[in-house]
Curated annotation (Swiss-Prot):
Protein name: Phenylalanine--tRNA ligase beta subunit
Source organism superkingdom: Bacteria
HAMAP family: Phe_tRNA_synth_beta1
Stretches assigned to the FDX-ACB domain: 743-836
Principal EC category: ligase
Location of the tRNA-binding domain: 39-149
UniProt EC number: 6.1.1.20
Subcellular location: Cytoplasm
Protein's gene: pheT
Manner of cofactor binding, per the entry note: Binds 2 magnesium ions per tetramer.
Annotated organism of origin: Prochlorococcus marinus (strain SARG / CCMP1375 / SS120)
Secretion signal, residue range per the UniProt entry: none
Sample GO molecular function, one term: magnesium ion binding
Residues that hold Mg(2+) according to the record: D498, D504, E507, E508
Reaction(s) catalysed (UniProt annotation): tRNA(Phe) + L-phenylalanine + ATP = L-phenylalanyl-tRNA(Phe) + AMP + diphosphate + H(+)
Length: 837
C-alpha cells in the first residue's frame, strides 16, 4: 500500500517528522518498506519559457530555441518536437541533470553545428504519464504555471513523500487511506479529519434474485447497483486526483473511472462502473436491475477484460452477468464490452462484498491479481461497502451535474452489534506491569543509575491505568460500556474482521501503549533447553550414517502424477504439472540422484534422507516418516595398487555398511526373506524386522530397472520406517547407558561348515547355534557362503565361526567338544544339514 503524506495530512493531524512517523507505523505493525521522495525525480528540472524559435540551418526536423530559465541570459536548446513553438512554458532539464527513465545525463553539446545547453522534456521522459506526443506544454496541462526557473514539483504533484507499507493479512483496513489515518490517530493520539459523507437518497430498494444469484446472497455476499445519469466520460480528473492515483500506482483513465478508484484508495472498497448504454446495445434491450446476476462461469466461456486480455474461464470462476451475458469477473476485473469510455453518459455503479475465498479461487484460475481482488481477498466489512458507495456518489455529484436515478441492493443489511467482554484482570495477567521511569534529582552517591547530569532514573512497576486502556480503545473507534469486571466493547466497522476476541483487544492495547513499556520477565527458575529423546536419536542416526560415508539429501516432496499409482495425493492448486502431487516414496528421486552422480564420473554415491511420504487409504491421507537411502559404487579414494580394481560393492558389503551405521542405536534389526518385490533383485534382497515388526527392506535394485538408469554398478536401496526406529530407540532401557565388563579370560573358536537348502537364512542358523550352545557360546557368525560349482543345485555352503568363552575360568577342550557335537547334531535335525567340517 502506497500512502501519500499530503493526502494523509488531510485526513489526520500529524505532529511529527517523516522519519518519526515511519518508525511509529513500523512499530505498530505497518512496516514501512520504503520512503520515496518523489521530488527527487525532478532534480535539475526547471520551468522555462520559449522566447523564440528558428529552423535549424542543417536539419529539417530540428528547431533552435531561445529559452528563458530564470538566469541572467536565455539559453539555447536544440529541440526536435513537432509541437514546439514560441510563447509557451516548458519543462527544461538543465546541464548535469540525470534523467533516470531514459538513462541520460544532460550535457552542453553541439547538434549539427548548433550548441544545445539543455533539453526540453516530455512528461514520459520524466517518468510521468504523457498528455500528448511531444514535449510537455504547461498551458495545456490544466495546472498553475510556476515561476520561470522554479522546479514545478508542486504543480506536477511530485512535492510528495510516499510511504510504501507492507499490509499484513489480518489488517485489511490498512489497504485504505482512511484506515491508515485511523492508525496514525490512534498511535499519536491526534485528531482525525475524515471526509463527511452525505447520504443521497438514503433508502436502497431490494431487487429480486434469479436462482443462481440467491446462492450468493445466502453466502452473506452483498451486491449493490446505482443508476447514475448525466455524466461525461470525456472529462479528465483534476491534477490532484490524477497525481494521487499515480502515486498509488494507478493510471488515470477519465473522471468517472478515476473517482471509483479514488474512493477505493480512500475507503478501501473496490467499485466498478458499467456503461449503461453499452449494456443496452449488448443485450438488445433496455436494461433493468433484474437483468443483473451473479453465477459460476461455464467451462469454455471467456471474457475480454478492460485490459484487453482474453480470459478463458472455468466453472470455479464467479462472474457478473447482464441478461446472462458475462460483463465482469466478480471482484477482479470488468469486461471491455461494458467499460466506461469517452462516450459514456450513464452508468450502473457496482459496489459489492464478495467472499474472500471465491475471489481468491477466481484470481488463481485466470492468473490475474488486481487492486480490487487484493482487497476482497483480505475481507471488507458490509458497513464499509455501503458508506463507500455514498462517498463515491458524493464525489460524482460534486464533479458532474449528475442525477442518481435508482439505488438497489440484493438483500437487507442487518448489522448485528457484538459486544466483547474485556476483563481488567485478564489484561494485567496477560501483559504484566508497566515500567514507569522517574527522575530522582536528589540522588545520593549510592544511586545505581546516575546519568551525566547527576540525576538518577528510578524504575517502578504498576498496573495499566483504566484511562490508558480506555484511551487506546477509543482511539481505535471502539465504544465502551463499564462493566463490573472491566468493559463491554463495541468494535468499529473497519476493525470487525480482526478484533473478534478479548485477546485481540488486549493485543491492541499493548500495541498502542508500546511493547517496550512493559516489564519483561524471564522464566523462573531458568532451565537449560535441550533435545527430546526422539530428537537425540534422529541426530544420532544422521551422525552415524555420515560417519560411515553417507551424505544427506533433501528432495522435493512435490512430484508429477504417476499414471500407475492410484493412491497419490493431488495438490489443489499446483503451479506446474511436474509438481502436482505429493510423493509416495523417496527412493525414486534417490535413484535419479545416483544416476546424475555416476554420469558425472563419480566413484560412488551413498546417500540417505529422513523424510515423509503421503498416500490415500480409504479416503484418508496418511503421512509416514521414512529413513531411505541408496548406495552405488565405492566412495573410498583409489590407490595405485587398487585403482584398476572394480569399485562396486556386493550385497553383504552394502548390508554391512548399513548395519554398522544403525548398530549405535542399540536395536536388533534382523533380516528375513522378502516376498516377491518388483523393485528389488529376487535373490539379493531382504525384509528387515525390528522387535518382530516389519521395519522395511534392503536389497539390490532389480536388473530391469538398473538398465534404465544406464549405470554399470549395482545399486542397493533401503527403506525403513523411521517412527518404528524412534519408538524402539527411545525406550528407557535403550537410552540408559549400561556397562559390560571386558572379558578377562581367553576365548576358544571353532569353525563349522555345512551344506543346506539355499532358502535357509544364515541368521536362523547362527541363532540356533547360540541357543543350543548356551551358556558357553558367546557368538556365532557367518564367515563364508558359496553356491555354484561342485555344489548341488538348490544347495548352498555356509561356514560359521563359533566363539566359546566362560565368565571366569579358561575353557578346556573337554568342555567345548560335547557342546560343539551337540550343535552339529542339532543342525542336522533342524535344517537337514550335511556337515562338511
Amino acid at each position: 500500500m502506497k500512502v501519500s503524506l499530503s493526502w494523509l495530512n488531510e485526513l489526520v493531524d500529524i505532529h511529527c517528522d517523516v522519519e518519526e512517523l515511519a518508525d511509529s507505523l513500523s512499530m505498530a505493525g505497518f512496516e514501512v518498506e520504503e520512503l520515496i521522495d518523489l521530488s527527487a525525480s525532478l532534480e535539475g528540472i526547471v520551468t522555462g519559457y520559449v522566447i523564440d524559435i528558428s529552423p535549424h540551418p542543417n536539419a529539417d526536423k530540428l528547431s533552435v530555441c531561445k529559452v528563458d530559465i530564470g538566469k541572467s541570459e536565455a539559453i539555447q536548446i536544440v529541440c526536435g518536437a513537432k509541437n514546439i513553438r514560441s510563447g509557451i512554458h516548458v519543462l527544461v532539464a538543465t546541464e548535469g541533470t540525470y534523467l533516470k527513465d531514459i538513462d541520460l545525463t544532460i550535457k552542453t553539446s553541439h547538434l549539427r553545428g548548433q550548441i544545445s545547453q539543455g533539453m526540453i522534456c516530455s512528461l514520459s521522459e520524466l517518468g510521468l504519464p504523457p498528455n500528448n506526443d511531444g514535449i510537455a506544454i504547461l498551458e495545456e496541462m490544466n495546472i498553475a504555471i510556476p515561476k520561470i526557473g522554479v522546479c514545478p514539483k508542486k504543480q506536477l504533484g511530485l512535492d510528495e513523500i510516499i510511504f510504501d507499507l507492507a499490509i499484513t493479512a489480518n489488517r485489511p483496513d490498512g489497504l485504505s487511506m482512511v484506515g491508515i489515518a485511523r492508525e496514525v490517530s490512534a498511535i499519536n493520539n491526534t485528531k482525525l479529519k475524515l471526509p463527511a459523507i452525505d447520504l443521497l437518497h438514503k433508502d436502497y430498494k431490494e431487487f429480486d434474485h434469479n436462482v443462481e444469484s440467491k446462492k450468493f446472497a445466502s453466502r452473506n455476499e452483498v451486491y449493490s447497483l446505482n443508476l447514475i445519469d448525466n455524466l461525461n466520460g470525456n472529462n479528465d480528473s483534476s491534477e490532484e486526483v490524477k497525481s494521487r492515483l499515480r502515486n498509488a500506482g494507478i493510471n488515470s483513465i477519465n473522471a468517472i473511472v478515476d473517482l471509483t478508484n479514488y474512493t477505493m484508495l480512500e475507503q478501501g472498497q473496490p467499485l466498478h462502473a458499467f456503461d449503461a448504454d453499452l449494456l443496452c446495445e449488448l443485450t438488445g434491450k433496455e436494461v433493468t436491475i433484474n437483468d443483473f446476476g451473479i453465477r459460476k462461469a461455464k467451462t469454455g466461456e471467456n471474457l475480454i477484460g478492460i485490459d484487453g486480455i482474453d480470459y478463458s474461464l472455468s466453472s470455479k470462476v464467479d462472474v457478473i452477468t447482464c441478461s446472462n451475458i458475462i460483463i465482469a469477473i466478480a471482484g477482479i476485473i470488468g469486461g471491455k464490452n461494458s467499460c466506461v469510455n469517452k462516450e459514456t453518459r450513464k452508468i450502473w455503479l457496482e459496489a459489492a462484498l464478495f467472499s474472500p475465498s471465491s475471489v481468491r479461487i477466481s484470481s488463481r484460475e485466470i492468473g490475474k491479481r488486481t487492486e480490487s481482488s487484493t482487497r476482497f481477498e483480505k475481507g471488507i466489512s458490509p458497513e464499509i461497502t455501503i458508506s463507500s458507495v455514498e462517498r463515491c456518489l458524493n464525489l460524482l455529484t460534486k464533479t458532474f451535474d449528475c442525477q442518481i436515478l435508482e439505488k438497489w441492493i440484493n438483500r437487507e443489511l442487518v448489522i448485528e452489534e457484538q459486544l466483547l467482554l474485556l476483563r481488567r484482570e485478564k489484561i494485567n495477567k496477560t501483559l504484566g506491569k508497566v515500567v514507569e521511569h522517574k527522575t530522582n534529582i536528589n540522588a545520593g552517591d549510592n544511586s545505581n543509575n546516575i546519568d551525566k547530569s547527576g540525576e538518577s532514573q528510578i524504575n517502578t512497576l504498576r498496573n495499566i491505568d483504566d484511562h490508558e486502556i480506555e484511551q487506546s480503545l477509543i482511539s481505535l473507534g471502539c465504544k465502551l460500556q463499564k462493566d463490573v469486571k472491566g468493559w463491554l466493547v463495541e468494535v468499529p466497522a473497519n476493525r470487525k474482521l480482526d478484533l473478534k476476541r478479548e485477546i485481540d483487544l488486549i493485543e491492541e492495547i499493548s500495541r498502542l501503549i508500546g511493547y517496550d513499556r512493559f516489564d519483561s520477565n524471564l522464566p523462573n527458575p531458568l532451565r537449560p533447553g535441550g533435545l527430546t529423546p526422539k530428537q537425540k536419536i534422529e541426530r544420532k542416526v544422521r551422525e552415524s550414517l555420515t560417519s560411515v560415508g553417507f551424505q544427506e539429501v533433501v528432495t522435493l516432496s512435490l512430484v508429477a502424477k504417476d499414471q500407475y499409482s492410484k493412491n497419490q495425493v493431488a495438490i489443489s492448486n499446483p503451479l506446474l504439472s511436474e509438481t502436482s502431487h505429493l510423493r509416495t516414496n523417496l527412493w525414486q528421486e534417490h535413484l535419479n540422484i545416483c544416476q546424475r552422480n555416476m554420469a558425472y564420473e563419480q566413484k560412488g554415491c551413498w546417500i540417505y534422507e529422513i523424510g515423509k511420504i503421503y498416500n490415500i487409504d480409504s479416503g484418508r491421507i496418511n503421512e509416514t516418516s521414512l529413513l531411505c537411502g541408496a548406495l552405488v559404487g565405492n566412495k573410498s579414494i583409489g590407490q595405485w595398487q587398487t585403482e584398476t580394481k572394480n569399485s562396486s560393492l556386493d550385497y553383504f558389503q552394502s548390508r554391512g555398511i548399513l548395519h554398522s551405521a544403525l548398530n549405535s542405536l542399540n536395536i536388533n534389526i534382523t533380516d528375513e526373506k522378502l516376498d516377491e518385490n518388483q523393485l528389488l533383485h529376487p535373490g539379493k534382497s531382504s525384509m528387515l524386522k525390528l522387535e518382530g515388526k516389519e521395519l522395511g527392506f534392503f536389497g539390490e535394485l532389480h536388473p530391469s530397472k538398473l538398465s534404465d538408469l544406464n549405470i554399470d554398478y549395482p545399486i542397493y536401496i533401503f527403506e525403513l520406517n523411521f517412527n518404528l526406529i524412534l519408538q524402539s530407540s527411545t525406550r528407557k532401557n535403550k537410552l540408559n547407558i549400561s556397562f559390560k565388563q571386558f572379558p578377562t579370560v581367553p576365548s576358544m573358536e571353532r569353525d563349522i561348515a555345512l551344506l543346506v537348502d539355499n532358502n535357509i537364512q544364515s541368521l536362523d542358523i547362527s541363532n540356533l547355534i547360540i541357543k543350543t550352545g548356551r551358556p558357553l557360546v558367546e557368538d556365532a557368525y557367518l564367515i563364508d557362503r558359496y553356491e555354484g560349482d561342485n555344489i548341488p543345485k538348490g544347495k548352498v555352503s555356509q561356514a560359521f565361526r563359533i566363539r566359546y568363552r566362560k565368565n571366569k575360568d579358561t575353557l578346556k577342550e573337554e568342555e567345548v567338544s560335547p557342546i560343539h557335537d551337540k550343535i552339529r547334531e542339532k543342525l542336522k535335525v533342524e535344517f537337514s544339514a550335511e556337515l562338511r567340517s
